[in-house]
């Protein structure tokens, strides 16, 4: 299953694609979508670049699901609003491509990838490189996006299995119910 991670940003949006085959993860691609070539006052133009860029990534790599970082209020409310609009353009591109979208906080991603929620950017980059056996460090934005894809591979698929078990009356693969083996 191909999982697309998106780290939204108005100037630079990171993307990362991993393939999950059972418990194994394999790097597929990563990169950035940049709007820095546009005038900072051209917000609609920047949002269109993000929308089109995310759609292009989806068409190229054909993911089955996407994982996007949740944005929280920063010290600067204007920056938070702009980031929220960038995030909205990315999510709109994903859902218009008929993708399910999972959302995770930066803390959840850092905890899933590095083992604790206060990990710095460099630690996330190092762990992404190790987990995906990359030959070199990915860029910060791409590393965060890959981290979001990894987070969904670990957390999201486990949550989906629990939901399916709940719908099936608490049974998981017919071997377990309420935590006890039968």
Curated annotation (Swiss-Prot):
The lineage of its organism: Bacteria, Pseudomonadati, Pseudomonadota, Betaproteobacteria, Burkholderiales. GO terms for molecular function: crossover junction DNA endonuclease activity; DNA binding; magnesium ion binding. This is Crossover junction endodeoxyribonuclease RuvC. Belongs to the RuvC family. It catalyses: Endonucleolytic cleavage at a junction such as a reciprocal single-stranded crossover between two homologous DNA duplexes (Holliday junction). Homodimer which binds Holliday junction (HJ) DNA. The HJ becomes 2-fold symmetrical on binding to RuvC with unstacked arms; it has a different conformation from HJ DNA in complex with RuvA. In the full resolvosome a probable DNA-RuvA(4)-RuvB(12)-RuvC(2) complex forms which resolves the HJ. Mg(2+) 1 binds at residues 7, 141. It is an enzyme of class 3 (hydrolase). The RuvA-RuvB-RuvC complex processes Holliday junction (HJ) DNA during genetic recombination and DNA repair. Endonuclease that resolves HJ intermediates. Cleaves cruciform DNA by making single-stranded nicks across the HJ at symmetrical positions within the homologous arms, yielding a 5'-phosphate and a 3'-hydroxyl group; requires a central core of homology in the junction. The consensus cleavage sequence is 5'-(A/T)TT(C/G)-3'. Cleavage occurs on the 3'-side of the TT dinucleotide at the point of strand exchange. The active site is at residues 7, 69, 141. InterPro entries: RNaseH-like_sf, RNaseH_sf, X-over_junc_endoDNase_Mg_BS, X-over_junc_endoDNase_RuvC. Its cofactor is Mg(2+). GO terms for cellular component: cytoplasm; Holliday junction resolvase complex. It comes from Polaromonas naphthalenivorans (strain CJ2). Mg(2+) 2 binds at residue 69. Its main location: cytoplasm. It holds the Pfam family RuvC. The gene is ruvC. GO terms for biological process: DNA recombination; DNA repair.
